[in-house]
Curated annotation (Swiss-Prot):
It comes from Desulfosudis oleivorans (strain DSM 6200 / JCM 39069 / Hxd3). Belongs to the phosphoglycerate kinase family. GO terms for molecular function: ADP binding; ATP binding; phosphoglycerate kinase activity. Monomer. Substrate binds at D19, F20, N21, R35, H58, L59, G60, R61, R117, R150. ATP binds at K201, E323, G349, G350, D351, T352. It is found in: Cytoplasm. It is an enzyme of class 2 (transferase). The keyword Transferase applies. This is Phosphoglycerate kinase. It catalyses: (2R)-3-phosphoglycerate + ATP = (2R)-3-phospho-glyceroyl phosphate + ADP.
Length: 396
């Protein structure tokens, strides 16, 4: 892909697709502006280069029609604060009003379009809507890695009509990190997969078995794997219909000589409650009336040892119900072990990213991805629609 820095943007209208799908409270105040901060380097560069910067994003799920609850106005205000310059807010994302606003822009001006999902054509990857977006710009920049797994009009079809397309700096960083970790990893390569459901991670597990030297499985999804090995997991959450698939993963790991690590002890309680009585037990001694809610201390040590000599680590999914302090120790221990390793480390997925921040080790992770679904699809070996679209339309 051609680098943004090789394109002359001075005086040009540049449409930047960002992901400003940020959490808002009841007063429409932003509670976490990480995604806005992540896009600032690209926007600042374009402003400094004298471009007329048109920023577009979605927010929430407004069902293809305007809804003031999902207005991007709060993000425009925050972006203006971060850039230390005014950011004008449009009333819509396409149409005569937007065209006239852009016509009045001077080099270095920034305009935020209203929520793309207020238009039904966005989610449908609609050609007419994509043409209307492309008509607003001379250069299209995609800096929204976190939505690059969705074939939406502003990510996919727009690249068919925009005169010039390029990835933004965040997109370049994301793809560079994943290229280093997944396409040409230094070995030993270890993947850590956690979270609640085998069903959501199964394609990733199946692909990772072709790539990794070691596979660590934790979180509630590990219960299904333990059950597949004949362990009685008490009242722990399992996906009965996927026990066969779990057995298949265990068998394939053995066939491919991938070291597979599962919990050897767990923290159990009779209910999901921060004040519930809890204890660490071996996985073969889980009480019939209890459920596993975190990995135990022996497992934390086992997983930590499996990471010590790793050269590449990719982690997606917590080891327990880490949002409750009572069941957070396992996830924090793994976060510390990942941070302590000498490996190139990539962490992604909302819960996992929150965990490394809460564990106080975020500054010692090589790369923290902004992508959730996009991160997972790369772990599945898929080509992301947004990335394929950029590759399809490149300046000669």
């Amino acid at each position: 892909m051609k680098s943004l820095k090789t394109i002359d943007v001075a005086g040009k209208r540049v449409l930047v697709r960002v992901d400003f799908n940020v959490p808002l409270d009841d007063q429409q105040q932003i509670t976490d502006d990480t995604r806005i901060q992540s896009a600032v380097p690209t926007i600042e560069y374009l402003v400094g280069a004298g471009a007329k910067v048109i920023v577009c994003s979605h927010l929430g799920r407004p069902k293809g029609k305007p809804d003031p609850v999902f207005s991007l106005a709060p993000t425009a205000r925050r972006l203006g604060e971060l850039l230390d310059r005014p950011v004008e807010m449009a009333n819509t994302c396409v149409g005569p009003d937007v065209v006239s606003r852009i016509a009045r822009m001077a080099p270095g001006d920034v305009l935020m379009l209203e929520n793309l999902r207020f238009h039904p054509g966005e989610a449908n990857d609609d050609d007419a809507f994509a043409r209307a977006l492309a008509a607003l710009c001379d250069v299209y920049v995609d800096d929204a890695f976190a939505v690059s797994h969705r074939a939406n009009a502003s990510v996919d079809a727009v690249t068919k009509y925009a005169p010039v397309c390029a990835p933004g700096f965040l997109m370049e960083k994301e793809l560079g990190a994943f290229g280093k970790a997944l396409e040409n990893p230094a070995r030993p390569f270890v993947a850590i997969v956690g979270g609640a459901k085998v069903s959501s991670k199964l394609p990733a597990l199946q692909h990772l078995l072709q790539e990794v030297d070691r596979l660590i499985i934790g979180g509630a999804m590990a219960n299904t794997f333990l059950a597949a090995k004949g362990v009685n997991v008490g009242k722990s959450k399992i996906e009965q219909e996927l026990i066969g698939e779990a057995r298949s993963v265990i068998r394939q790991a053995a066939e491919k000589k991938v070291e597979l690590f599962l919990p050897v002890d767990v923290i159990v309680a009779e209910k999901i409650d921060p004040d519930a009585d809890r204890q660490a037990v071996s996985v073969d001694r889980i009480p019939a009336d209890a459920m596993a809610l975190d990995i135990g201390p022996e497992t934390s040590r086992l997983f930590g040892d499996a990471l010590k000599d790793a050269k590449t680590i990719v982690w997606n999914g917590p080891m327990g119900i880490f949002e409750m302090e009572a069941f957070a120790a396992g996830t924090k221990a793994v976060a510390a072990a990942v941070a302590d390793s000498k490996a190139f480390t990539v962490v992604g997925g909302g819960d996992t990213v929150s965990a490394v921040h809460e564990a106080g080790v975020a500054d010692r992770i090589s790369y923290i991805s902004t992508g959730g679904g996009a991160f997972l699809e790369l772990m599945e070996g898929k080509t992301l629609p947004g990335v394929a679209a950029l590759e399809r339309n490149q300046p000669a």
